[in-house]
Amino acid sequence: MSKVYEWFDERLELQAIADDVSSKYVPPHVNIFYCLGGITFTSFLVQVATGFAMTFYYRPTVAEAFASVQYIMTDVNFGWLIRSIHRWSASMMVMMMILHVFRVYLTGGFKRPRELTWVTGVIMAVCTVSFGVTGYSLPWDQVGYWAVKIVTGVPDAIPVVGAALVELLRGGVGVGQATLTRFYSLHTFVLPLATAVFMLAHFLMIRKQGISGPL
């Protein structure tokens, strides 16, 4: 194995990269509350893994969505566990994200020169909430259906463009198959991709600027 590693290291300088990653200075004021962002990231990875596993069995149609979720819970090996972990990690991600935002705000981590780091964090917070809204509808049960109907109806109060926004969200005048398809696409592709991109930018800026100092 050492010869294989040496072969790759000679060409890619793996050891230099590893040394750079592992030798970053950590200020002495850093405590357990600075781990909240990392826990949020870990929860996101769990979400991706368990969500990907469920896509093999979930059917995003109004006629089969609920039955496919029931199938995952009752017939798929460990399906109940995978879905439960998905739900638990979703709650964990939201809770840790909120605590992380509070920690950053209270310690002044949003101030110059870290404004862009804060902006990417706020965007990811919006994505996190959007995960919850879109995922809530996917079982297409009574709770999910009426939640979607209420949420997508909120923009109707906006003057001039409200009705157009509602139709855009629903894929039509009423809530139906087009709505479920839109929410499924957002939940499984658009939001994960957007979150991953902003996470990368977030981490690179933290890496470049370092952890903010104490108050």
UniProtKB/Swiss-Prot annotation:
Instruction: Tell me the protein's name.
Output: Cytochrome b6
Q: Which residues bind heme b 2?
A: 86, 187
Q: Which SUPFAM superfamilies match?
A: Transmembrane di-heme cytochromes
Q: What else is known?
A: Heme 1 (or BH or b566) is high-potential and absorbs at about 566 nm, and heme 2 (or BL or b562) is low-potential and absorbs at about 562 nm.
Known cofactor(s): heme b; heme c
Residues annotated for heme b 1 binding in this entry = 100, 202
Q: How does it assemble?
A: The 4 large subunits of the cytochrome b6-f complex are cytochrome b6, subunit IV (17 kDa polypeptide, PetD), cytochrome f and the Rieske protein, while the 4 small subunits are PetG, PetL, PetM and PetN. The complex functions as a dimer.
InterPro entries hit by this protein = Cyt_b/b6_N, Cyt_B6_PetB, Cytb/b6-like_sf, Cytochrome_b_N_euk/bac, Di-haem_cyt_TM
- Identify the gene encoding this protein: petB
Listed under GO biological process in this entry are: photosynthesis; respiratory electron transport chain
| PANTHER family noted in UniProt | CYTOCHROME B (PTHR19271:SF16)
The regions listed as transmembrane in this protein's record are: 32-52, 90-110, 116-136, 186-206
Specify whether Heme is a keyword of the entry: yes
Where does this polypeptide localize? Plastid, Chloroplast thylakoid membrane
NCBIfam families cross-referenced by the UniProt entry: PRK03735.1
